[in-house]
Amino acid sequence: MMFISLVHHPVYDRRGNIQTSSITTFDIHDLARSSTTYGVERLYLVHPSPLQRQVAERILGFWEVGGGKEWNPLRSQALEVTRVTASLDLAIEDATKLTGEKPVLVATTAKTKEGQTTFGQLRKNLDRPTMIILGTGWGLAPEVIDRCDLVLEPIWGPTEFNHLSVRAAGAIICDRLLGKRNI
């Protein structure tokens, strides 16, 4: 069983300072659609600010019970996997309750580091509940990465340019780990 947590704090800003980023509607919609397509159990939007969580809840509410459900039922269905939470600890707690065991925590980063887990290695070991942790802004702060069990290798295309949006990275990660393909 796979979970995704989209963490908004603590993350880096473009200057390398620790910050809190804002929740965006694009991230919510696109990551929910990818999560539902690939059978992710839950997508957690993790944000410490009550006001930012209210924004996310309002967006979700429009699609769950508001006019959005009738206007675009597929979008409404995709968003059903999404939960808003104040901390990564609460997301982990919820996933643990659902599965009966703490998920393997997998940090993501765009930086290559020694000891990272490859997509192939992780794909072969998805027999335990697993939580992929995505960072917004310019990536997860060390305090989040350090508490994870594994760090996933970066996504690289054929060029040296490596600056994907978090929602594009999330979709690629879902496909590489859960997609139907012959290996």
Question: Where would I find each of the regions flagged by the language model?
Answer:
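Generic hydrophobic-segment detector
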Residues: 25, 85, 125-129, 159
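Secondary-structure boundary/capping motif
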Residues: 52-55, 114-115, 140, 161-162
